[in-house]
């Protein structure tokens, strides 16, 4: 399954950090790419550094128009808008696991009505207000049934050695 993420909107300066965290979650939880508009280019640089160190081919693509992206993906990917409205994740997840390509859409603020209409699925993550970061993490984990948590990258220069107590990071050249 190929998973991509679109983050719509950016609010003031505080959102550079939130945007970075949304992208880090997308990467760590198995997405291959995140699309963003109106974002500080340093966010892309941060993610490139993370991928260089921890491995993987995660891409950050800066776009001019989220509407144009959604229209271009219509028919080639299942567009899944993560929201507090819509059908529950429990009701939708079974059919979504059978899809070949998913574009998960998360919003930074009030999401324009177009998103609800362009989405193939409006999926409720809990029916309560919370962050787009938590919605994305829950969705990607449920979609992949936790398999992404044990995924490794052969090109990683650092790897965490799981331990019950303490911490240990293996450093070296990629395999």
Swiss-Prot record:
A Pfam family of the record is Trm56
User: PANTHER family given for it?
Assistant: TRNA (CYTIDINE(56)-2'-O)-METHYLTRANSFERASE
Q: According to its UniProt record, which protein family does this protein belong to?
A: Belongs to the aTrm56 family.
User: Which coarse location class applies to the principal site listed for this UniProt protein?
Assistant: cytoplasm
A GO molecular function held by the record: tRNA (cytidine(56)-2'-O)-methyltransferase activity
- Catalyzed reaction equations: cytidine(56) in tRNA + S-adenosyl-L-methionine = 2'-O-methylcytidine(56) in tRNA + S-adenosyl-L-homocysteine + H(+)
GO annotations of cellular component type: cytoplasm
What keywords would UniProt list here?
A: Cytoplasm, Methyltransferase, S-adenosyl-L-methionine, Transferase, tRNA processing
The major lineage groups are: Archaea, Nitrososphaerota, Candidatus Cenarchaeales, Candidatus Cenarchaeaceae, Candidatus Cenarchaeum
Q: What is this protein called?
A: tRNA (cytidine(56)-2'-O)-methyltransferase
What is this enzyme's EC?
2.1.1.206
Would you kindly state one Gene Ontology biological process term found in this protein's UniProt entry? tRNA nucleoside ribose methylation
List the source organism.
Answer: Cenarchaeum symbiosum (strain A)
């Amino acid at each position: 399954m190929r998973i991509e993420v679109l983050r719509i909107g950016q609010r003031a300066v505080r959102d550079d950090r939130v945007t970075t965290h949304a992208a880090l979650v997308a990467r760590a939880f198995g997405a291959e790419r995140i699309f963003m508009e109106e974002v500080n280019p340093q966010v892309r640089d941060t993610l490139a550094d993370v991928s260089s160190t921890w491995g993987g081919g995660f891409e950050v693509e800066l776009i001019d128009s989220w509407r144009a992206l959604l229209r271009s993906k219509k028919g080639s990917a299942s567009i899944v808008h993560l929201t507090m409205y819509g059908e529950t994740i429990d009701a939708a997840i079974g059919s979504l696991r059978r899809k070949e390509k998913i574009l998960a859409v998360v919003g930074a603020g009030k999401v324009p009505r177009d998103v609800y209409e362009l989405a193939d699925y409006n999926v409720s993550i809990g029916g309560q207000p919370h962050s787009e970061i938590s919605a994305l993490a829950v969705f990607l984990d449920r979609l992949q049934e936790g398999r992404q948590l044990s995924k490794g990258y052969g090109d990683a220069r650092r790897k965490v050695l799981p331990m019950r107590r303490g911490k240990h990071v293996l450093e070296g050249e990629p395999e």
